[in-house]
Amino acid sequence: METKDIIIIGGGAAGLMASCAAVHVLKKRGSVLVLEGNAKLGRKLLATGNGRCNLTNLNVSPAHYHGDVTVIQDLLHEYTPEAICAVFREMGLVTKPDSEGRVYPQNQQAAAVLSALRWDAEKYGVSFSEEHTVSKIEKVKNGFTLICTDGTQLFTKQCILTCGGAASPRHSCGEGYTLAKQLGHTVTKLYPSLTQLTVRAKQWKTLSGTRAPANAVLLADGKPVYEESGEVQFTDTGISGICVFGLSIYAGEFFALGTIRNKKYTSLAVQLDLLPDMAYQDVLDYLLEMTKLYPARAAGDLFSGLLNMRLGYMLVGVAGIAQSDPAVKIKAPQLKKLASLLKGWRLDITGTKDFSAAQVTAGGVPLTELDPHTMASKKAPGLYLAGEMLNIHGDCGGYNLHFAWASGITAGKSAAYRCLKEEKR
């Protein structure tokens, strides 16, 4: 049976960073192996940030995280965005923030991030084994026995679980939850986050592919609970876009648990202000002006100088106006309704897209079952956990990768120091 000092299960962001951190401590005084179930390491990492890899965010703080947030405050304090950027700079990767604080590699290529991690790990002796999926893990004397789906058995003194979550199943299948349970850990309710919202509306597919700037307000039982601004993308079944992803964090909680920020609610809707830079009266004045200037123009064309025409036609119909009616026929109350729709179009939310369309997983192994200063398991000595499989998920904008790096570094260092300590006994 092959034996290693440290085996890391999962070759994604947290796992690769853990391997680098571990070998820097060991300095070739121990062996580190990364097992990856996919054919290639870091597949999900390559897809992040539309292939540019949003590494971290200069605005990192506990306020941008959800789940067991109080447990990770010290971790975020120790591993600031500047500290993470410094780690990558030592690997030869230059980073650059954008105007909103999102940090990317200078060359805007996720492949450069993956290469930096792999080269650094290999330089100090990390070995990799791809297409190796661990199906069973057992705690034995002085370590762990790992059994792979192909029958291969391995022994390791320390084990780090960085298997990722259930989101993007093409890149991560979430087997880490099963392995964690085999060693006594629990897993909270899992649900998709940073994903599209589905809505209830007639003739919705006519909007598919349309984009518009908007202010989006999440309404729970009719009361605003969260809002974000940005570009909204209209899909076949609902809405998408970065600002919608922000809403999906809370919508996901609602549909999975019936709560938002742990408070019970019974209904969910989104209200879109499609003209966030204009006041209601300005919108109404514009509509009145258009009806006077172009009395023969079809109602559906009233918005041609103001809004995407497909949205204009949709809202005219929602207001109960025939799209082909001449503008002169539109009554004042109907114009007011149109203006109100433009400034506050309310749509009932029917759900979120599933894990296949989600960027991250909400829920996971509770951090209360770990020592947050080492990421060591309280259930199985010698076991460490990091990354998305834990009950922490962040906002869109580099926050989830930041936690992967920070927890990966902590787990890797801690496992390595434990190895060295055991050698001295």
Identify the residue ranges that each predicted region occupies.
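Core beta-strand elements of the Rossmann-like FAD/NAD(P) dinucleotide-binding domain
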Residues: 2-4, 148-158, 227-229
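Glycine-rich FAD pyrophosphate-binding loop
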Residues: 7, 23-50
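Short hydrophobic core segments
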Residues: 7-9, 35, 134, 153-172, ...
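Glycine-rich active-site loop/strand segments that organize a redox cofactor
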Residues: 50-100
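A glycine-rich dinucleotide-binding beta-alpha-beta segment and adjacent secondary-structure elements
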Residues: 130, 313-393
